[in-house]
Amino acid sequence: MPSKTSSRFANINPNVFVSTIMIIAIFLAIVILAPDAFELLTQQLKNWITESFSWFYVLSVAFFLIVLGYIACSSSGKIKLGPDHSQPDYSNSSWFAMLFTAGMGIGLMFFGIAEPIMHYVSPPSGEPETILAAQQSMRVTFFHWGLHAWGIYAIVALSLSYFAYRHDLPLKIRSSLYPLIGKKIYGPMGDAVDTFATIGTIFGVATTLGFGVTQISSGLNYLFGFEPTSFSKVVLIIIVSAMAALSVGLGLDKGVKRLAELNLVLAVTLLAFVFFTSATVYLLQTTIQNTGQYISNLFEMTFNLYAYQPNGWIGGWTIMYWAWWISWSPFVGMFIARVSRGRTIREFIIGVMLIPTGFTLIWMGFMGNAGLYSILHDGNLSLLNAVQRDSSVALFEFLHSLPFSGVMSLLATVLVVLFFVTSADSGALVVDYLTAKSEDSPVWQRLFWIVVMAGLAIILLLAGGLTALQSATIMSALPFTFIMLLICWGLIKALRIDSTKMQAIQEARTTPRAIQNPRSWQQRLGLIMHYPHSKVEVDAYIKKHVQRAFESLEREFKRRHLTVAISETDDGLQLKVDHHDEINFIYHVVSRETMPPSFMLEQEHNADVEKYFQAEVFLREGGQNYDVMDWTEEDLIQDIIDQYERHLYFLSVMRAQTGN
């Protein structure tokens, strides 16, 4: 009998889990023993990467956008992230709220006011502190927070959700490489990829926690006069982590989802307040103009490396942003994938790319232009000086110039805290997925990673290693960019196969045979109007008649030297024909609940008749939307052969295309 200790750790992937802990321990030891030398080394490496590989980042991010646009417009856009019959797990509003808060919600709070003013003071080109500099600052801010950022997230999220929900692979980064390395994803190579993604996620969240408490401290200092100290920042990290632990303990639906929805409501409230209490017409006009300039200059900005006027601006801003989004993409991409099951690929790309980007542009447009208006028209030099001195106070200094500044500063502080909580709890869920063998892990594993990230942030905060950690996180983006390019290759390859299968099946489509054996018309009518109210009746049919049909086919397939497996599932019976290196054939009969037709309700006048059950056919790609209940064994065998013939046609098309 296994011990309680062994069962408690049974769901841990030891290779990824232990490797992650060891790397974190080594990193902490270096930072604590030689903090100055390590910070200097990481800073120099970061500078070398941004100077030498800026062209590579620019081309890669542009390529990600092109790939997403191609997939969305192609026939692959109709493919679902899951079986063909699957439906979205979350409503559109809940889905968008979770995308927004996990992706960059906290960044908008930090940079919404500060970044446009920083570009206004120090633009990439031209004279600073002019009207042209103000226009350029908004255009650049839109560029950094717009389509490119969400394109990076979308590539990782799309690949993960496609392979996890469409092909039943683990929801892990390694699964994205399956078309390229096959079953090696389950070996050391896959463990290495997941370990790398885990380290990047932990470092990214820990950096956010460490630097984020600075903005929370600024809000508390403004509201209550609390002077920020190392002790107060440690206490804040502990409080935020405790709230994240509570959210994680409640789970994705009750905790993370509810918190994300609350965040979105409060963020919209703050944005509406700024819009109506600032220069409303000015904000509308400038935001619309900024959006037009952003769209019209999108291609130029995408490939602009400032090669003819070299300066450190692009490395300190655009390349830093691209590297930061890439380093966060395993974390955000996995979380987006986790909540996107059941959507079509086209719906997914449009949703992930356009909806959060639209909200981000509105937020940056209203907040950034409100800050610039305060400086340009109201002469608010204190805001300008505050941003130059400490960008974390920008939001609170701006709110000070508006009515009800105390109340709104309190709301802003609460929002910052909640955004940090959602980043921490989402990060813990993602790290838990990466280091566990399955998604059904105990709560203590998620809580453990909350403690690890909080402890890492506290130690580095006290030891002065947060800047080094931030540099290390950005540096990790370079090798992961190569992995993302491989992910694109594997995704396109898999989608091509899926699209070919859809086309081949369409070309070889046969109508379900239904009832072929001779029967009187009265018998046929009675059978097609038979709506079983009991699941037991359908289960009994599957266990008896479907089982016999499967066994008859099994004997014939084996006589022809094919490997066949019949297996019971939670909801039915499955027949699988093994084709070795090619895609296997699956015919699955499922006992499925469905709504009765309206005429049935009218005829029976029975309040209890709210549902009936059917024996629906599922193939590898999902439900086929026809019922085989009451078919004879011969009918079933003929239908299976029809479906198998379509599958063989698809395999022949694939062999012709690949030359095998």
From Swiss-Prot:
It is a multi-pass membrane protein. Residues 35-52, 115-139, 217-230, 285-316, 369-401, 468-471 are periplasmic. GO terms for cellular component: plasma membrane. The chain crosses the membrane at residues 14-34, 53-73, 94-114, 140-160, 196-216, 231-251, 264-284, 317-337, 348-368, 402-422, 447-467, 472-492. Residues 1-13, 74-93, 161-195, 252-263, 338-347, 423-446, 493-660 are cytoplasmic. Keywords: Cell inner membrane, Cell membrane, Membrane, Stress response, Transmembrane, Transmembrane helix, Transport. Uptake is activated by NaCl, KCl or mannose gradients across the cell membrane. Inhibited by the protonophore 3,3',4',5-tetrachlorosalicylanilide (TCS). InterPro entries: BCCT_CS (IPR018093), BCCT_transptr (IPR000060). It is found in: Cell inner membrane. Disruption phenotype: Deletion of the gene completely abolishes glycine betaine transport. NCBIfam families: bcct (TIGR00842), PRK09928.1 (NF007399). Energy-dependent uptake of glycine betaine in response to high salinity. This is Glycine betaine transporter. It comes from Acinetobacter baylyi (strain ATCC 33305 / BD413 / ADP1).
